[in-house]
Each structure stands twice: as C-alpha cells, then as structure tokens.
Amino acid sequence: MSIILGIDPGSRITGYGVIRIVAGKAEYLGSGCIRTDLGELPSRLKQVYDGVSEIITQFKPDEFAIERVFMARNADSALKLGQARGSAIVAAVNALLPVSEYSATQIKQAVVGTGGAAKEQVQHMVTHLLKLSATPQADAADALGVALCHFHTRQILIKMAGRSTGSVRGRYR
C-alpha cells in the first residue's frame, strides 16, 4: 500500500489530490485547493509551502508528483508558476518524499487517453476512475490526475522491469 500526493501548482490556486494504492487499484483519500491571499508573491509562495506541508502532515504520503511548468502566455506568469512549483517541491523534499514530475500532456494521456484533452474531460475521468460521488473542482481534479498519472506510470515501469528481469507481473519467481 502506498499513498500518492499529486499537486497542480499555481501562485493563486494550488490543487492537491491524494490517492492510496491498494492491491493495484487507486482509492480516493482527499482533494482540494490551497488558495493564497492577494498579497505579494513571497507571501503567496509561503502559503503554498505551508499548505503543502500541512497536507503532507495530514495524509502522510509516500510519494509526491507535480505537474511541470508549461509555457504560459507571458513570461511573468510562467515564472510565478515555476516559483509556486518550487515552494511545493521544497515542502516535499523537506518531508523526504521522492518527487516525480509530469507534463500536462502526459497527465491527460494517462487519465483521458489523449494528450489534448480538455479540463472537463479530465474532471469527468477522474470522477469515474476514482468512483467519486461529485465532480471535484478543476484544480483538485487536475491534481488527482497528476497522482493517477504517477500511479499508471509506476505500474508501467514495474511491468517493464518484470519483463526484463525474468519476473512475472513485477514479482520474482
């Protein structure tokens, strides 16, 4: 059993999603958004760090996955997003969690089946895959998508390792 924390970073809203892997299946544990005040950027970055640290303390994840920076419409937005990512990553590293990063295309491909999926499609598939009774907010759904992408990627790597080592289904004979 392992717990994965997925993060969809932002300088205003950072989504988080937590899943537990039991017997090769993902179970929903929690999700939500860290909303920062409208203050100066350094203060907002501290709020992201503190929020992610609280989530780590609450859920005690074994692994941490985060969305990579994409090229935003302007350089200032991309820099702020990168700094918010850095704040979240530092919280994970301080908690001694392994950090994995995925592009938006990889996440959409893993969750929806196409790298060009719309946010609504990600929300729908996250709701379906985790058997949720209600659709999560877009940022929380994206973060759950990050966690699911990490889980699926890890499963593929385990299967590939099993084939190359002579093991069966990721286990040695």
From Swiss-Prot:
Signal peptide feature range: none
Residues reported in the UniProt entry to bind Mg(2+) 1: 8, 139
Protein family membership: Belongs to the RuvC family.
Cofactor(s) needed by this chain: Mg(2+)
Keyword Nucleus: no
Entry keyword annotation includes Methyltransferase: no
Entry's Gene Ontology cellular component terms: cytoplasm; Holliday junction resolvase complex
EC number: 3.1.21.10
An example molecular function term from Gene Ontology annotations: magnesium ion binding
Function comment: The RuvA-RuvB-RuvC complex processes Holliday junction (HJ) DNA during genetic recombination and DNA repair. Endonuclease that resolves HJ intermediates. Cleaves cruciform DNA by making single-stranded nicks across the HJ at symmetrical positions within the homologous arms, yielding a 5'-phosphate and a 3'-hydroxyl group; requires a central core of homology in the junction. The consensus cleavage sequence is 5'-(A/T)TT(C/G)-3'. Cleavage occurs on the 3'-side of the TT dinucleotide at the point of strand exchange.
Localization annotation: Cytoplasm
Keywords annotated in UniProt: Cytoplasm, DNA damage, DNA recombination, DNA repair, DNA-binding, Endonuclease, Hydrolase, Magnesium, Metal-binding, Nuclease
Name under which the protein is recorded: Crossover junction endodeoxyribonuclease RuvC
UniProt cross-references to InterPro entries, sorted A to Z: RNaseH-like_sf, RNaseH_sf, X-over_junc_endoDNase_Mg_BS, X-over_junc_endoDNase_RuvC
Main location: cytoplasm
Pfam family, one: RuvC
Gene3D superfamilies: Ribonuclease H-like superfamily/Ribonuclease H
Binding note for cofactor: Binds 2 Mg(2+) ion per subunit.
PROSITE patterns (UniProt xref): RUVC (PS01321)
Active-site residues, record numbering mapped to chain: 8, 67, 139
